[in-house]
Amino acid sequence: MEVTLKEFRELCTSISTESSYVKKTKLISEFIHRGRDYNDVYIITKLLLPGTGKLIYNINDKQLVKLFSKIFCHDADEMYKYVINIGDVAYVIGSFLKKSKSVVDYATESTLTLHEVDCFLTRLSTVTRENDQIKEIKKIIPRCTPNDLRHIIRLIKHDLRMNIGPKHVLSGLHKDAYGIFKLCNNLEQVVQRSLEDNIKPLIELMVPLQPMLASACKTFSEAVKKCPNGIIVEFKYDGERIQIHKHDKNFKYFSRSLKPITPHKVTDFEELLDRAFPSAKNMILDGEIILIDTETNQPLPFGTLGINKKSMYHNACVCIFIFDCLYFNDTVLIDKPLIERRNIIHANIKEIPNRILLSEVKNISTDEELSKLLHIVLSKNIEGFVLKDAKGVYEPGMRRWLKIKKDYLDGCVMADKADLVVLGAYYGKGNKSGILSSFLMGCYDTKSEKWCTVTKCSGGHTDLELQEINDNLSVVPFDRNAIPDWLSINKIHYPDVIISDISLAPVWEIIGSEFTRSSTHTASNISIRFPRCSRIREDKTYETANNLNDIKQLYAVSISPPEE
């Protein structure tokens, strides 16, 4: 018998009211393994993780209100006032459905199946015109109770309000399912293998893996402890992460956030990669894409890969620095030592100057050798360097590498920049009157599952950039009497406006003179002194920005005493 939306709603309610993550996972496990077949388990898992799927609707709260106001024949502004006051667009739309009985027929008993809901969501993701969206919504409303509709809206918003993420959902499927998901990022494969109890390391060509990451490091002794098998130092250029997949004659390129790389950044690279790796039938490479000045052979600053910025540099071309190989000619390499993976690249690459290059590395064993490298970093346009265990395996999604960035080397007390999310903003005064000119920056606390405030940032933007931010930032007035459930904030930092949809909030790289303590900020009382925006991280999303655990680690590194 098919799983109904009502059963799914009841599961979500049980999960949302349970505070223990172990018990949340147990609820999911019991529901999933209740004699379900593959199709049921896959749909349940997919809908429990609406944010990890491939369905994109590009419909924010205002657009949802606009669509349903036309269906319900209600004033959109009136509906939206309720959304601002209550902070829950799904609840508001469900309530207005009840008020619209004379205009719209709706169900008094829930009979929708999850399969029907999944089909509706798939159709909705394929239409972009307002009239077509309304047409699809009108088809399903007669089958919906108000509670059904609320839940469907939450699926569209990728937020079921259960305070749970992929790790806990997939652990309910199989104890090792989350580890495999990080490798292949393919939910269908994970579900199938979990049900077959065939959980083995899985890499699928043309499907991105979670990239291996680096955490901040301040001293050589720390690096020695974390890299007991010898240290490989790799120069870190200020570019964009790229994961390259080749299968026969086909190529795909993925960003750090696992999204396809903008095509103009990788034009002509199929032919270049074939020349650089002539023996490769199939492969997965990890690297950094940057713009290089062809006259000086020096990398250009971050952000120059955009179409407009790139056109300003006439003597420049896009270059990919390859620093790792995860798969080569039908052989999975992630469990091989780094030295062996590097040797495979070295044996198979034919470098193309300024286009395809093997990243430069050094083997070091003493503090003196590290000091010499510091001078190279300071004298060149290099962001810093990454320290890697010479015999380390590739662990997708894990921060096992170490990084030392130039900002610390230049004398800044901060050991790292922080990638924070814009939570709200404040109107300026004087010549900036009426313009949002100061921004409330924050991070996500995985324990409380709330967004915490870190700092207020008003520097780093030109007037033109500030105007673009004002034009593009999606905000609503901040209501002091209806603070959103997702936000942890003290009264002193209440903004004038707040981000309307946290999933659409931009990520900015914030740098300052130092991390500091602040009793008024809610990110474990950690803040940043003299903050400024050093760049807008278009390659990151609210999900991949630094979370509170990252901020705590960065703070700890910044206050640890220097090595004598």
From Swiss-Prot:
KW Zinc-finger (keyword) present: no
Lineage: Viruses, Varidnaviria, Bamfordvirae, Nucleocytoviricota, Pokkesviricetes
Species for this entry: Fowlpox virus (strain NVSL)
Cofactors named for this entry: a divalent metal cation
Keywords attached to this entry: ATP-binding, Cell cycle, Cell division, DNA damage, DNA recombination, DNA repair, DNA replication, Ligase, Metal-binding, Nucleotide-binding
Protein name: DNA ligase
Primary gene name: LIG
Binding of a divalent metal cation 1, residues: E288
Enzyme class, broadest EC rank: ligase
GO biological process: cell division; DNA biosynthetic process; DNA recombination; double-strand break repair; lagging strand elongation
Binding site for ATP: E234, R241, R256, E288, F323, R399, K403
Gene3D superfamilies listed in its UniProt record: 3.30.1490.70, DNA ligase, ATP-dependent, N-terminal domain, DNA ligase/mRNA capping enzyme, Nucleic acid-binding proteins
CDD domains: OBF_DNA_ligase_III
PANTHER family: DNA LIGASE 1/3 FAMILY MEMBER, DNA LIGASE 3
Family: Belongs to the ATP-dependent DNA ligase family.
Cysteines engaged in disulfide bonds, as pairs: none
InterPro entries, per the entry: ATP-dep_DNA_ligase, DNA_ligase_ATP-dep, DNA_ligase_ATP-dep_C, DNA_ligase_ATP-dep_cent, DNA_ligase_ATP-dep_CS, DNA_ligase_ATP-dep_N, DNA_ligase_N_sf, NA-bd_OB-fold
Record-listed a divalent metal cation 2 binding positions: E383
Pfam families: DNA_ligase_A_C (PF04679), DNA_ligase_A_M (PF01068), DNA_ligase_A_N (PF04675)
GO molecular function: ATP binding; DNA binding; DNA ligase (ATP) activity; metal ion binding
General function of this protein: DNA ligase that seals nicks in double-stranded DNA during DNA replication, DNA recombination and DNA repair. It is not essential for viral replication and recombination.
Keyword Electron transport appears in the UniProt entry: no
Active site: K236
Domain of life of the organism encoding this protein: Viruses
Enzymatic reactions: ATP + (deoxyribonucleotide)n-3'-hydroxyl + 5'-phospho-(deoxyribonucleotide)m = (deoxyribonucleotide)n+m + AMP + diphosphate
Enzyme Commission (EC) number: 6.5.1.1
